């Protein structure tokens, strides 16, 4: 059973009576948690006055595995080209990522032998970012308003400058918080993916008929197909040749 125990300085997220995470309070703001389904809550933070900046932070216990869907899996750490590695840049600044980089908007996930925890944006159209980094207090899940990428941005094989967006001041900020007990396995993010699919899913009407889509698909593939004089054949799909 999950409970939220509030005090003046923080909200404790408790499982079977023991704290597994904590949510630091924000000055001049009130937090509320509305159950959506088992293990999932809509977290709403209302401020006394409109503001154009907010960080909604959940500090979980030390993690055995972390993930930012589509960006970082266990901290990455492979490859020879520029890549987001670990939870911080070389100068010690925690990475922050714009919502659109992640396959679930501004989503961060961590797990240990007691629980799995995820935090992400409630509205994909909100200007948000996320950060996931370890401190002595635990694993910090942060939903950031407005969108930003710090301390630098990863472009196509090179680093760019930091980015900080803007947003209209508001007095209401929303997030989705997921907490599930451990079943003893690892990489237990399937419930997160399943919920996100249901939560964000919506019907899409095909812009053209099935026959026309098939015709266009074949035409596009033929356009990309190339055969060289030495017999090599392949599809040009945006890949680049890098010498060396």
Task: Please place each PLM-identified region on the residue numbering.
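Carbohydrate-recognition beta-sandwich/jelly-roll modules
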Residues: 1-244
């Amino acid at each position: 059973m999950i409970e939220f125990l509030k005090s003046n300085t923080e909200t404790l997220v408790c499982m079977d009576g023991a704290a597994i995470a904590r949510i630091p309070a924000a000055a001049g703001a009130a937090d509320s948690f509305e159950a959506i389904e088992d293990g999932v809550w809509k977290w709403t933070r209302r401020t006394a006055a409109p503001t154009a900046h907010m960080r909604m932070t959940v500090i979980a216990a030390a993690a055995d595995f972390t993930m930012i869907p589509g960006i970082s899996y266990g901290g990455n750490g492979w490859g020879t080209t520029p890549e987001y590695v670990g939870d911080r840049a070389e100068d010690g600044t925690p990475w922050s990522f714009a919502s659109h980089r992640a396959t679930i908007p501004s989503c961060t996930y961590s797990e240990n032998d007691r629980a799995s925890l995820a935090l992400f944006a409630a509205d994909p159209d909100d200007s948000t970012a996320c950060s996931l980094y370890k401190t002595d207090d635990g694993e910090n899940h942060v939903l950031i308003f407005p969108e930003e990428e710090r301390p630098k941005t990863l472009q196509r094989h090179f680093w760019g400058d930091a980015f900080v967006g803007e947003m209209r001041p508001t007095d209401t900020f929303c997030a989705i918080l997921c907490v599930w007990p451990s079943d003893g396995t690892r990489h237990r993010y399937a419930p997160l993916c399943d919920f996100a699919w249901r939560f964000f899913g919506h019907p899409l009407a095909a812009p053209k008929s099935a026959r026309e889509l098939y015709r266009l698909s074949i035409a596009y593939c033929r356009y990309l197909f190339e055969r060289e004089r030495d017999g090599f054949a392949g599809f040009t799909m945006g890949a680049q040749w890098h010498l060396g």
